[in-house]
Amino acid sequence: MVELRPSLDIVAPFFNEAASASAFARLLGELEVAVAQRFGMTVHKILVDDGSRDDGAVRFSQALTGSWEIVRLSRNFGKEVAVLAGLDQSRGDMVLIMDADLQHSLDISLKLIAELVDHPDIDVVYAQNDRREASWRRSQLARLFYSLINSSQRFDIPENAGDFRVMRGAVARALTSLRDKRRFNKGLFAWAGFRQKALPYSPEGRASGTSKWSRLNLIAFSLEGFTSFSVIPLRLISLSGLLAALAGALYGAKVLFEVIFYGIAVPGYPS
């Protein structure tokens, strides 16, 4: 009887990463060998082309080894949707999500997997950016964002935790059942629950190119998360509506009072 080995799926979305394709394919190959040796697991690699305008998909297909597939999206939907597309294809006992820009190292990836393997009571191990390289202003803005978004919820979104994480297959299945059109993965990962553990890390520098996240993209992303996972905007809108209604009622009472008791002719409806 053939004994089935546990399996690990690696989901890696990419956008215009042709320059780093060969290096990332090598990293995945090294990771596959290390995972097989240390944990006795088979590895299947799922790369998601998020509408790249370069030949990254071709370069990946030429450089990848072992078991792999490339999911090609019809346009650039954004990383959040690309991650979902990869999770939709995953069938492994565990699923590792990592970036294709080489900022997520082999060493940290193995540590994440080891934590999950060694702790059967844990369902998710996520990498938490220690922000050593971030400016003081950016760190303070991030802290303010998380304090606001977590101030009115029954669950907390971990600070500085992104998509870089490993999870059990059951968690991946639960996440794929959440079909939000406007996705904010940080919030969805936390909302889904399960037993989660943080692993601090410092991301590597990009191997080539620049970040695809502009300041405007970051602001839009933050607003998406804030409006999706905080009741503060709804309460502010409700309060502003209440104040506007109260102001209108007071003004209407003032107009009627002047017409009835002082005979002041106000042009318009009270005359």
Predicted features by range, described:
Residues F24-L27, L31, L112, L144, ...:
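A ubiquitous structural signal for well-ordered alpha-helices
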Residues M1-S7, K186-S271:
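Hydrophobic helical membrane-anchoring modules
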Residues M41, V125-Y126, I157-N160, R235-S238, ...:
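Short, hydrophobic secondary-structure boundary micro-motifs
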Residues V33, N150-Q153, F194:
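Non-catalytic alpha-helical coupling and interface elements of nucleotide-dependent molecular machines
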Residues F39, P120, Q153, S230-P233:
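Residues at helix C-cap/C′ positions in short coil/turn segments immediately following an alpha-helix
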Residues M1-A134:
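Structured catalytic core of nucleotide-sugar glycosyltransferases
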Residues L73-R75, K79-Q89, L106-N185, E204-L223:
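Acceptor/aglycone-binding surface of glycosyltransferases and processive sugar-polymer synthases
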Residues F15-A19, Q103, D107, T176, ...:
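Residues in soluble alpha-helical coiled-coils and helical-bundle/repeat scaffolds
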